[in-house]
Design a protein with these regions (language model features):
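Single conserved hydrophobic/aromatic residue that forms the stacking wall/gate
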Residues: 1-8
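Metal-dependent amide/peptide-bond hydrolase catalytic core
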Residues: 13-185
Length: 185
């Protein structure tokens, strides 16, 4: 809150983006996205308050918490330099999912043996939040994705969309994979 909240908001936005481009290890992916900016209702009145909302995700827990600290430092610095009152709330969120290399290779081998090499794809690193991260921080595990789409049945929408659907034939495949993993590991 201050007399020039829009300017402070802009300063925060630019400065926060420097964290993932300047402060991180370039070999450890992370993303900071400001996804909502709310403040003001007209063109000729400076809003008394502007609210920024976003998300920060990282592939390394040490960096994740160091970045949280850095975000606080950046925001505090802007508050001091502008005289603004800035209330920062960081929801820690889900921990990073860690795929244990041994368990992951075993799961991949089981999938290839059970369903065939043409049905197994090695996925790329993703920045999604997943509660499985709580498990993978405690015990060796492997997070894998079960393909549930089917172009022939026009089941093509991604998760978190209003038209999401699954090909129910995938349920049997998932059950077989989980049962084989459970019996093997």
């Amino acid at each position: 809150q201050c007399d020039w909240s829009s300017d402070v908001c802009s300063s925060d936005l630019v400065a926060l983006q420097q964290i993932t481009s300047r402060d991180r290890n370039p070999l450890s992916p992370s993303v900071l996205s400001i996804c909502a900016i709310n403040g003001g209702f007209t063109t000729n009145v400076i809003p008394s308050e502007v609210k920024l909302m976003g998300t920060f995700r990282a592939m390394d827990e040490t960096w994740r918490f160091a970045a949280h600290k850095r975000i606080q430092e950046v925001v505090d610095g802007i508050a001091r330099s502008t005289g603004a009152e800035i209330d920062l709330k960081i929801d820690v969120g889900y921990p990073t999912v860690y795929n244990d290399p041994i368990v992951t290779e075993k799961a991949r081998s089981i999938a290839v043996e059970t369903f065939g090499i043409d049905k197994v794809e090695d996925g790329e690193i993703r920045m999604g939040a997943e509660d499985f991260g709580y498990y993978s921080q405690k015990i060796a595990g492997c997070f894998f994705r079960l393909g549930t789409g089917n172009k022939q049945k026009n089941i093509i929408s991604g998760v978190h969309t209003p038209t999401f659907d699954i090909d129910e034939d995938a349920i049997e495949i998932g059950m077989r994979m989980m049962a084989t993993l459970g019996a093997t590991l």
